[in-house]
Each structure stands twice: as C-alpha cells, then as structure tokens.
Swiss-Prot record:
GO biological process entries: 1,6-anhydro-N-acetyl-beta-muramic acid catabolic process; amino sugar metabolic process; peptidoglycan turnover
Species assigned in the record: Salmonella arizonae (strain ATCC BAA-731 / CDC346-86 / RSK2980)
Protein name in UniProt: Anhydro-N-acetylmuramic acid kinase
Keyword ATP-binding set for record: yes
Pathway stated in the Swiss-Prot or TrEMBL entry: Amino-sugar metabolism; 1,6-anhydro-N-acetylmuramate degradation; Cell wall biogenesis; peptidoglycan recycling
Length: 374
C-alpha cells in the first residue's frame, strides 16, 4: 500500500487562490506538514468566471485556459517544495482536484468538467498526479459531489458523538457523521459565492473582510424569502450545485424586484441566506452535538455568529479546534483521495453521492515508469 508524503491541490468555487497542502499519509494517519495559498492571476480568474456563467468560449480559449491552469498548479506545487526544501522524489503523488467550470450531474447526459491539465503538472513538477476524481462517480449514477464527506468521516467521525462537518467555500456542503449510520452529505447551497460576487461588483473587493460591509446593512426579509423559495433548497439529497447555478445572474434575477435596495443591505441579506439555508438543513437532519466548520466562510464572523444563534444547543466551532486547519481541509482531502486511488481503495461514498457502488476514483498520470497501483 502506497504511503509517504502526498500533496493536495485545490482550487475551489470561491476562486480565492490555489490551496496546496503537504501531508504524510498511510492507512492509520493523515498528518499535515505544510501548506500555502498561491494567487490566481486576474485573467485566469476572469476566464473561469466567464465559463461558469455560461459565456461562450472557443475551443481554443478553453484549451489555453486548461494549459494555463495546469502550469499554475505546477508553480504552486513547486513553491511548496522549495519552501520545505523537498525534491520531487520525496513526494509519492499529487492529488489535484482541478478547477470546476461546469457541474451538471442530472439529465440524459450528466457531466462535470474540471480543467487544469494534469499532464502539465507532471511535466513541470516531475511528480505523479492523480486527478479527474469526480467523473467516475457520475458514470456510476452519482452526483460526483461532494467527495469530501468520506475524508471528514475518516478524520472527524466519532463512535458516540453526533457530528456534522460544514464546509463553507463558494458553495456550502454538509457531512452528516452519525454513529452507526451511513455517512451522508450534500451541497446546501451558496456559501461565500454570492457575497463575494456582490462585493466585487459593488466595491471591487474580492471578499467582505471580517463581514465589515455586511454588518453595516440590515437583512431585507422579502428578498431573503424570495431567494429561499428557489427549488434547490427544498430538493432532496443527494444533490450538488455550483457556480453554473448560483451565480451573479441568479442574484440579479432576484434583485429585479428590489430596485432601490441598499448595497450593504443586500450583502447582509446574502450572509443571512448562507446562514439560514445551512441551519435549515442541519435541523432538517435532526441537529447534532457539534457542528465543525471549515472553508473560507469559517472566517466570516457574521455567518458564524448567525449559525450559532440559529442552532441553539449545538456547539458551532471551526475544525481548527479539532486540530485540522479549516483553510486546508479540502486540499488535504484530495491528497488523501490520491492515496486511496494509489492504494486501490474506493474514494466515493454511495450514501453521499447516490452512485450505484463505491469505486476507485480518478485518473493516474505517472511521472515514472515504475509506478504501480497498490
């Protein structure tokens, strides 16, 4: 069974940077050793947003973006290696999620697309890459997401305590870790995505630091109720979503009925939307003893305070309290999924994604001819 140092690379729906994590992994432990966040240049961020919001691109433009992102991921990995004084031979493999640009897991031809060419990562790092984790699950009838609940269960599951793990990235997702029950999990709806999109359009800021702007505003209840009436929130799990659905266009359609709304009031309402939509799902599943929060949204004091207020009797705290950095959780998960793939172990949970069976996930891009699975 493969064990040793792995690197996880994650570029999520928030587009707040490429997260890169170094970890020692074997069948008994996942020990994070180092991490960094690598910036995404503005022109790449724009290209990603254009695709996600349905703008037309030529195949040439898509191919260029795929190559450029692959090179960017390689730069981020090489920066971490240099920081830690490591050589490619010191790393077993890189687990790279890629950048999701479209996710449509339902219909006659379900599909998901992550770009960032793994061949370029191998070529520029000299390290084996495991990538393309989601499409096998979709081929087996699953949603292809979320995949991280399996990792949450491995690291944070408890034999007697009823726990949930909440990741608030661009999209928020919930993992239900209940004793003696199959793990479940799904996307609850928007996390940071709409808040970030609004403050970018209104103030040219990438995010609302410390929720300072949202705190200036007041929640517009009719707008909140209108947004919460979206069918996604009432849909049954398994379910997953992304920027192709909850985007600036979605927000504009809801704002059309509120032409005089104050910009900071809209921001306050979007923060409340995130907190309320999450808390509804926590309570719908019977609540828990501990809600462990990770992702960029765990650093939003307003959202965290509202979750605590909406969920009395539940301990709401970041995963940092359990010794796992909330900022690095997803990148760490994909390092672990790479280890699972090379060990010949399944990476998905059918109870989460709805797939017909558990399966080894991903495609392997070997750096050396000596690589063997399991």
């Amino acid at each position: 069974m493969k064990s040793g140092r792995f690197i996880g690379v994650m570029s999520g729906t928030s587009l707040d940077g490429v997260d890169v994590v170094l970890a020692a992994i074997d069948e008994t432990m996942v020990a994070q050793q180092a991490s960094l966040t690598w910036p995404i240049p503005g022109h790449l961020k724009k290209g990603i947003l254009d695709i996600c919001q349905g703008q037309l691109l030529t195949l040439s433009q898509l191919g260029q973006l795929d190559t450029q992102l692959g090179r960017l991921f390689a730069q981020a990995v090489n920066a971490l290696l240099a920081q830690q004084h490591l050589q490619p031979r010191d790393i077993v493999a890189i687990g790279c999620h890629g950048q999701t640009v479209w996710h449509e897991p339902t219909g006659d031809a379900p599909h998901t697309l992550q770009i960032g060419d793994n061949n370029h990562i191998v070529a520029h790092t000299g390290i084996t890459v495991v990538g393309d984790f989601r499409r096998r699950d979709i081929a087996l009838g699953g949603q292809g997401a979320p995949l991280v609940p399996a990792f949450h269960h491995a690291l944070l599951g408890h034999p007697t305590e009823k726990r949930m793990v909440l990741n608030i990235g661009g999209i928020a997702n919930l993992s239900l870790l209940f004793p003696r029950q199959a793990v479940r999990g799904y996307d609850t709806g928007p996390g940071n995505m709409l808040m970030d999109a609004w403050i970018w359009r209104q103030c040219a800021q990438p995010y609302d630091k410390d929720a300072a702007w949202a705190k200036e505003g007041k929640v517009i209840l009719p707008l909140l109720q209108k947004m919460l009436s979206d069918p996604y929130f009432a849909a049954s799990a398994p379910k997953s979503t992304g920027r192709e659905y909850f985007n600036y266009g979605w927000l504009e359609r809801h704002l059309a009925a509120f032409p005089g709304a104050s910009a900071c009031d809209v921001q306050a309402t979007l923060a409340e939307l995130t907190a309320v939509s999450i808390s509804h799902q926590v309570l719908l599943n019977g609540g828990c003893e501990r809600l462990m929060v990770c992702g960029g949204g765990s650093r939003n004091p307003l959202v965290m305070a509202r979750l605590a207020a909406l969920l009395p009797g539940i301990e709401v705290a970041t995963t940092d309290k359990a010794g796992i950095s909330g900022d690095d959780m997803e990148a760490l998960a994909f390092a672990w999924l790479a280890w699972r793939t090379l060990a010949g172990l399944p990476g998905n949970l059918p109870s989460v994604t709805g797939a017909s069976k558990a399966s080894i996930l991903g495609a392997i891009y070997p750096a050396t001819p000596e690589l063997r699975v399991n």
